[in-house]
């Protein structure tokens, strides 16, 4: 069973020299399994900043080179680092309501975005149990600034890349538990897949060629600017 959750793929390209160098420098393989998972999780969450890449189908090494990512792309990098360090993992596909992106998406970008946005999280097998990990998507600096800028919110929150029931008490640290940050926005479940390559072969963002071009060359840059503004306030 474990072999299929540890294999390398085009997207989960953990033999890439940059990924191998990172693993060596961080000394993750020298840690116990629990500490290794936590360290990789924290790295992907906080050192790879929240932002929008050119495409969901880019490789883990490209995400690392970009230095930023979102739910799908950061998940690909997370899986590559986990598998390279002998932690079995898989991907779970969904769509989410675009309302949770409002604020990161604004103006014509938000108005023209699909109502349902392709989404995924990573599931790890640790101590014979599967854990659902989603909260690596947003870096803690971004979350802290968002909480400061919405200090009046003490309950549910939806927007700026967040969809949760309790905005003040987020479950974003891994300690043998599931972690979530956008799960309250899920509106369709595609189930689990061995790797993102297989998930994307069956499901992907439904968008016209024109809108895809506009996203790559205009929309995502405006979205990244909005995210930076929040983080730097």
Language model features with spans:
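Secondary-structure boundary elements
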Residues: 1-66
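His-Asp-centered catalytic microenvironments across diverse enzyme cores
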Residues: 7, 11-14, 96-233
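Glycine-centered secondary-structure boundary/capping sites
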Residues: 18, 22-27, 80, 145-146, ...
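Residue-level signal for well-ordered alpha-helical scaffold segments within enzymatic catalytic domains
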Residues: 42-43, 80, 84, 120, ...
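Active-site neighborhood of thiol-dependent amide/isopeptide-bond enzymes
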Residues: 52-117
């Amino acid at each position: 069973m474990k072999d299929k959750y540890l294999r390398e793929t085009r997207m989960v390209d953990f033999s890439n020299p940059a990924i191998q160098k990172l693993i060596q420098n961080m000394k993750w393989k020298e840690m116990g399994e629990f500490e290794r998972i936590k360290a990789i999780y924290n790295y992907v969450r906080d050192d790879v900043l929240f932002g929008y890449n050119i495409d969901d189908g880019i490789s883990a090494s490209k995400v690392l080179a970009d230095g930023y990512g979102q739910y799908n792309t950061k998940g690909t990098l997370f899986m590559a680092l986990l598998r390279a360090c002998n932690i079995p993992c898989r991907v779970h596909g969904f769509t989410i309501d675009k309302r949770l992106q409002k604020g990161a998406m604004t103006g014509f970008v938000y108005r023209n975005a699909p109502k349902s946005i392709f989404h995924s999280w990573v599931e790890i097998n640790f101590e014979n149990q599967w854990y659902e990990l989603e909260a690596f998507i947003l870096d803690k600096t971004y979350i802290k600034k968002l909480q400061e800028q919405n200090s009046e919110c003490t309950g549910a929150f939806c927007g700026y890349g967040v969809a949760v029931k309790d905005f003040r008490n987020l479950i974003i640290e891994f300690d043998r538990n599931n972690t979530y940050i956008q799960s309250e926005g899920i509106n369709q479940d595609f189930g689990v897949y061995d790797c993102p390559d297989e998930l994307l072969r069956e499901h992907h963002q439904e968008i016209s060629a024109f809108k895809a071009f506009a996203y790559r060359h205009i929309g995502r840059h405006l979205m990244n600017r909005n995210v930076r503004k929040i983080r730097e306030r």
